[in-house]
């Protein structure tokens, strides 16, 4: 009888917090705990001695009641179910002691619900128990079950049963059709506690899967029905389909139930969870667990959570489920700490707890989870798993195996947590107060919750596939069935934020259970999918030759920053994480600035002008140009002065653009150049880099550190020696030039410190020719005549002059100033100042593009991608004004001559870019060659062989880029051209006759129709 009684208890519909004892086959149906008001499980047991199942149920109810003090509706419901379950009265195996109830303890625990409904359930359970005791007639059970199921349906959206990976019954599976539900509930209840004699009236809860029960299926196959949330059985031979368990299988199931209550197909036993621990703290709760053979498996789902948490019990609320469950296992010190923590958390969480009685405290929940884990260990893990599988037959046997594995994992995790708890580290399990601050980190919280749920998943695991899929949604909010689960997730999130544990405890038992398994599965599935997609994409990129080696670290930083900001705006990224990453990026740039700045100089950011300026630490003088440390000071100073003047002028023309580009380019390029050429190349490379850097660094524009107002001297006034920047060239020309410049530079990356100079210069020459020829040619040709001379002079004097060649109509010597300003300024300045000065209105948009292009080109150069295009745009844009600046900048970096380009060519830097400015239609190759030779000499002295290799590769890449600029460049160029064309049309008055500028008349549709008809006629 012991076995039988065990099975019977397992059968009990009540999923109250039963002692950890194995619960026979508690129907997974009784989700609602049946804590009775009865204080002692013992009392309950005696009252139900006739049918041990009834007794068990009563005991469970009593225990629950005791813990709850007032029976909850759920409990009452559970009680009602009990009669159904207790059709065959087993001996009152349930001792008052939780241990006695062990058979159903786990299930009861899981089933125990902390809802106000529990009390009602208790009452109904008691009634049901009395009925069971009297006759336990199948009819009574049927009617009770029907009522119970109806109640459950009303109370909770049906939750598909998932195999209880851990001994917790799955959340209520979706209700099968009313008839089926009633019968299945009956059957499960009966099966748990039925005697073999009851076979006639015995019914199996079809919501529970037979997988894992270990019965021979023969010709029958179990099929899950999503609509009803139940399984139906299909005879593969006869093609017969039945909602009820076929006799062939029913006989086996009944036999199993009697012999292995814990593995009862009802899997109700899984509810037995850790009732013992629970019972110790709450004897009543434990008792309810014992009586845990809640019949209604659906309720069981709820009950499982409730039972597990039985948080509704006032005692638990005071004490905490964790305390109740773990009391026997945990040392006093830990208990006290938990108690203190719980009190703290409860105050904060009470509203949340109210939201979900089930989750009295997250801490409790966590603790409960641990006890459950322990209980699972105490209880028969295999049996629990079997029960879970049975109860949660919503999943295939395969899944059940997974559940078993998961259960084991969960148990392991819980054990570890328990150990940590014992060590006093409550935070591990999460029972310790969680950072209430984690709300912003709700994602982290969710992750933690999910992990916790993973633990709970043991119990929830059995949810039917449907429920699993639903639960899989992180919060389960997506599905009504998971209503509870969703709430649990939500609550758990809140709790996580407030006190991970408290909410989780109550709420998570049921909801988390349901969701945990699905979530764990979902997480694993998600991880798998992510890994698959990531591997595929990575492999494709690799095959296509797209790798990080082709771009600089700063490019990566820029893209990462942009992506993170976009994700953050979408709410998919933690703000604190983003802030930390942005700070890291800012720090990287800061290091770059420090390394790039020549000795004796400090680099500062001017927020107003959005560009760098440099302060001589000895003299305290400040300047926009990048100081050329390697060039002779005089040369560098002269160039810097000129550059400064030009830059300032250009800045005046378009301060905003210049500052933006200067900032980023100077920061990124300046430092790079400085590093490699100790400031020689800094201007040139910085300038090209600037535009892109601005974006990449996002630090500069987005996170630019405020310019130290007092420490750095104010940016130097633009020197007056350099001629004022020529008026902006015609918008079309300017736009084109800028576009070209931007395109080329945008595609390039800042060259490596060693190679920066050469690469930018060479690519710029090539690029300049190509791109500048395209759009700049017209403008350059016009400006080249005027600036050609200047450029020639500069080129001759400084290879840089070539760049300053007159790409823009007006030569912008801003190169030096822009360069000095900072490569960001230079970068932006190149386009903005070089071209921008020429065409300030057009240059602003173009400048922005140019910056990107330039940055890109520098980057490409740096990465070996599109150095040439960047340089080209560089040369083009700055040819008139900017050429000097661009070429000067690169040269400056190398020779610090750029400023001289337009105004007074300083001594030609050894590595001036060989390519003539595109606008001038390429200065004589001789000059370029000379410049290149100079550069080569410098590079030889400055650069290692690797750098040379890199530079040669860059040149090749630049040539390629020249032929086809990057998409970005193309887009920006096209946009610029359109804008320039619009400006031209408007300025020239052509717009009046251009239909593109006409406002669409209201009858435009009719007009369009007429037009279409005209050609036909």
Curated annotation (Swiss-Prot):
SMART domains: WW. There is a cross-link at residues 301, 348, 519 (Glycyl lysine isopeptide (Lys-Gly) (interchain with G-Cter in SUMO1)). Residues 40-69, 181-200, 461-474, 657-671, 764-786 have a biased composition (Low complexity). The modification Phosphothreonine is found at residues 172, 479, 516-517. Residues 1-141, 160-202, 421-519, 621-676, 706-792, 899-994 are annotated as: Disordered. Coiled coil: none annotated. There is a cross-link at residues 335, 348, 519 (Glycyl lysine isopeptide (Lys-Gly) (interchain with G-Cter in SUMO2)). Changing residue 228 to M: Found in a patient with microphthalmia with limb anomalies; uncertain significance. SUPFAM superfamilies: WW domain. Residues 214-248, 595-629 form the WW domain. Binds FMN1. Interacts with the Arg/Gly-rich-flanked Pro-rich of KHDRBS1/SAM68. Arginine methylation in these regions has no effect on this binding. These WW domains interact with Arg/Gly-rich-flanked Pro-rich domains found in several WW domain-binding proteins (WBPs). The N-terminal WW domain has the greater ligand-binding ability. This is Formin-binding protein 4. The gene is FNBP4.
């Amino acid at each position: 009888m012991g076995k039988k009684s065990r099975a019977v208890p397992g059968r009990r519909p009540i999923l109250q917090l039963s002692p950890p004892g194995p619960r026979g086959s508690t129907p997974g149906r009784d989700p609602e705990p049946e804590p009775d008001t009865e204080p002692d499980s013992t009392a309950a047991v005696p009252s139900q001695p006739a049918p041990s199942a009834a007794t068990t149920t009563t005991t469970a109810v009593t225990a629950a009641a005791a813990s709850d003090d007032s029976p909850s509706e759920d409990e009452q419901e559970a009680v009602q179910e009990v009669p159904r379950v207790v059709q065959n009265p087993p001996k009152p195996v349930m001792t008052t002691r939780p241990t006695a109830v062990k058979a159903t303890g786990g299930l009861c625990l899981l089933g125990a619900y902390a809802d106000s409904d529990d009390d009602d359930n208790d009452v109904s359970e008691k009634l049901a128990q009395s009925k069971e005791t009297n006759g336990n007639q199948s009819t009574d059970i049927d009617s009770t079950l029907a009522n119970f199921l109806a109640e459950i349906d009303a109370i909770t959206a049906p939750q598909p049963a998932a195999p209880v990976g851990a001994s917790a019954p799955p959340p209520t599976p979706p209700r099968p059709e009313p008839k089926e539900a009633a019968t299945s509930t009956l059957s499960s209840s009966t099966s748990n506690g039925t005697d073999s004699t009851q076979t006639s009236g015995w019914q199996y809860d079809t919501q529970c899967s037979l997988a894992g029960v270990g019965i021979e299926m023969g010709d029958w196959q179990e099929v899950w029905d999503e609509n009803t949330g139940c399984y139906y059985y299909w005879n593969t031979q006869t093609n017969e389909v039945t909602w009820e368990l076929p006799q062939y299988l029913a006989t086996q199931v009944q036999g199993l139930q009697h012999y292995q209550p814990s593995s009862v197909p009802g899997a109700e036993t899984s509810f037995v969870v850790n009732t013992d621990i629970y019972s110790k703290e709450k004897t009543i709760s434990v008792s309810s667990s014992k009586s845990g053979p809640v019949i209604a498996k659906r309720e069981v789902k709820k009950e499982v959570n409730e039972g597990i948490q039985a948080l509704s019990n006032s005692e638990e609320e005071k004490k905490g489920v964790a305390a109740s469950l773990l009391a026997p296992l945990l040392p006093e010190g830990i208990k006290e700490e938990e108690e203190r923590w719980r009190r703290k958390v409860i105050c904060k969480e009470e509203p949340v707890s109210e939201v979900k009685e089930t989750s009295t405290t997250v801490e409790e929940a966590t603790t409960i989870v641990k006890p459950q884990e322990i209980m699972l260990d105490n209880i028969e893990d295999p049996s629990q798993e079997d029960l879970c599988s049975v109860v949660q037959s919503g999943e295939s046997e395969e899944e059940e195996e997974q559940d078993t594995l998961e259960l084991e994992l969960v148990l392991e995790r819980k054990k570890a947590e328990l150990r940590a708890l014992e060590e006093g580290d409550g935070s591990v399990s999460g029972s310790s107060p969680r950072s209430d601050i984690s709300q912003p980190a709700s994602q982290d919280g969710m992750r933690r919750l999910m992990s916790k749920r993973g633990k709970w998943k043991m119990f929830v695991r059995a949810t039917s596939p449907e429920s699993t899929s639903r639960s899989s949604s992180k919060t389960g909010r997506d599905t009504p069935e998971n209503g509870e689960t969703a709430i649990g997730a939500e609550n758990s999130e809140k709790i996580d934020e407030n006190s991970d544990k408290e909410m989780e405890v109550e709420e998570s038992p049921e909801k988390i259970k349901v969701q945990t398994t699905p979530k764990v599965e979902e997480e694993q599935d998600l991880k798998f999918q992510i890994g698959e997609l990531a591997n595929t994409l990575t492999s494709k990129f690799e095959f296509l030759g797209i790798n990080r080696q082709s771009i600089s670290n700063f490019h990566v930083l820029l893209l990462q920053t942009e992506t993170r900001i976009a994700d953050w705006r979408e709410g998919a990224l933690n703000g604190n994480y983003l802030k930390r990453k942005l700070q890291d990026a800012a720090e990287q740039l800061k290091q770059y600035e420090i390394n790039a700045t020549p000795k004796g100089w400090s680099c500062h950011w001017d927020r107003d002008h959005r560009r760098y300026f440099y302060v001589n630490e000895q003299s305290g003088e400040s300047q926009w140009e990048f100081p050329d440390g390697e060039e002779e000071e005089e040369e560098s100073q002269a160039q810097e002065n000129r550059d400064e003047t030009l830059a300032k002028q250009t800045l005046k023309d378009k301060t905003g653009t210049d500052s933006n580009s200067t900032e980023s380019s100077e920061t990124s390029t300046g430092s790079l150049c400085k590093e490699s050429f100790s400031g020689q190349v800094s201007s040139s490379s910085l300038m090209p880099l600037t535009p892109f850097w601005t974006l990449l660094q996002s630090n500069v524009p987005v996170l630019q550190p405020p310019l130290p107002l007092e420490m750095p001297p104010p940016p130097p006034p633009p020197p007056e020696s350099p001629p004022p920047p020529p008026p902006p060239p015609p918008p079309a020309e300017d736009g084109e030039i800028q576009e070209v410049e931007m395109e080329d530079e945008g595609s390039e990356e800042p060259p490596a410190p060693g190679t920066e100079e050469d690469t930018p210069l060479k690519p710029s020459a090539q690029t300049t020719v190509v791109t500048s020829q395209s759009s700049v040619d017209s403008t350059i040709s016009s400006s080249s005549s005027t600036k050609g001379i200047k450029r020639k002079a500069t080129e001759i004097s400084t290879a840089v002059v070539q760049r300053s060649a007159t790409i823009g109509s007006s030569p912008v010597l801003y190169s030096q100033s822009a360069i000095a300003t900072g490569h960001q300024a230079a970068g932006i300045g190149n386009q903005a100042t070089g071209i921008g000065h020429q065409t300030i209105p057009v240059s602003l948009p173009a400048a922005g593009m140019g910056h990107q292009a330039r940055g890109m080109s520098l980057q490409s150069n740096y990465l070996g991608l599109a150095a040439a295009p960047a340089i080209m745009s560089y040369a083009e844009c700055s040819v008139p004004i900017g050429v000097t600046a661009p070429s000067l900048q690169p040269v400056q970096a190398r020779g610090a001559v750029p400023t001289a380009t337009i105004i007074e060519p300083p001594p030609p830097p050894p590595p001036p870019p060989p390519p003539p400015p595109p606008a001038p239609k390429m200065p004589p190759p001789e000059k370029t060659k000379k410049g290149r030779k100079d550069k080569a000499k410098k590079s030889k002295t400055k650069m290692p062989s690797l750098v040379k290799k890199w530079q040669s590769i860059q040149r090749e890449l630049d040539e390629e880029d020249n032929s086809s600029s990057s998409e970005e460049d193309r887009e920006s160029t096209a946009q610029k051209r359109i804008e320039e064309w619009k400006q031209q049309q408007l300025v020239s008055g052509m717009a009046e006759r251009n239909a593109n500028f006409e406002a669409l008349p209201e009858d435009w549709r009719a007009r369009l129709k007429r037009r279409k008809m005209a050609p036909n006629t």
